[in-house]
Amino acid sequence: MFIVGKTGDDVNEYTCTQFFDVSTCTVDSGDPFSVSSDDSEPSGIAFNTDGTKMFVLGANGEDVNEYVCSTGFDLSKCRSVADKDVSGQEANALAMAFNSDGTKMFIGGFAGDDVNEYTLSTAYDVSTATFVDAFSILTHEGKITGLAFDTNGQRMYLSLIHI
């Protein structure tokens, strides 16, 4: 399990002895993976399916930072390779998701009242991302803090905070 937070500038890794049971998780003994050279307020994290690419959403830099990992899900083997500025659509990005093949990316956050869709011409390569459209959530009167899709991409789930 991997966690980022706005008060730190790193990715924290946890090991769970039982699948999907957070009561069995403990923080790994190694140092957290610093993303301070890319953003001081990481707010979201995602991986490609085999863990060889990690994406960290930066609330401060208003961008998506891409890392290549030579060994899947091993943060000690990751290095920064690209970023995508999303400030034109979301000035305080907090939530991110990809479709299953990495050709679509979705961003939501505090500043906008919408989910922004991007097409990636090369799967899981944010440098090839192009803004497509935005889906308004104004009628739900909240700010997006979490974003996920079901396995077939037909249902979108949002976590909202009302302020």
Predicted regions and their residues:
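A short beta-strand motif characteristic of beta-propeller blades
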Residues: 29-35, 81-87, 132-138
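Conserved small/polar residues in nucleotide/adenosyl-binding loops
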Residues: 161-163
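Residue-level detector of Asp-centered blade-edge/turn motifs that repeat once per structural unit
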Residues: 49-50, 100-101, 151-152
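Short loop/turn segments immediately following beta-strands, especially the blade-tip
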Residues: 15-23, 68-76, 119-127
